[in-house]
Amino acid sequence: MMMDILMYLFETYIHSDAELQVEQDELEDELLRAGFQQKDIYKALVWLEELAALQQSDEHSAISTCIASASTRIYTASEMQRLDLECRGFLLFLEQINVLTTETREMVIDRVMGLETNEFELEDLKWIILMVLFNVPGNENAYTLMEELLYTKEQGILH
């Protein structure tokens, strides 16, 4: 599954501060050896390229300047099908605590919709948010807070 590949790459190369300059062929070979399917590998690499392109494009900057900070996001039918009520509520929560801006929220939604999956849940959304925040310069504090939210939930809350 594409989401599994993205999480594998994020944990192996990005989150672990491993060497980021890996040749695509070398990366594909490693993913094949790890048991992933060629077509899923290709889709995941395209997804990552599109994330990088979003970060560099002016499209989202233009969108965010047009959206008032107090506005409410209206989701399309296809977005609501992919992002259930819990996911949409979590996105709103992250905006309210300033982890996501309107720009990064739109990037997250774009990348969620770029996934080719019928099964998507809150934990998947959290990983997508981490990937987006990691790839957008100037979001280090938001990334750290999101990382804490993700790992605190996974490890359980200590008393």
Swiss-Prot record:
InterPro entries noted in UniProt: Smg
Sequence intervals crossing the membrane: none
Signal peptide residues on this chain, from the entry's feature table: none
Domain of life, source organism: Bacteria
PANTHER family for this protein: PROTEIN SMG
Sequence similarity: Belongs to the Smg family.
NCBIfam families, A to Z: PRK03430.1
HAMAP family: Smg
Name the record gives this protein: Protein Smg homolog
Organism of provenance: Vibrio campbellii (strain ATCC BAA-1116)
The gene coding this protein: smg
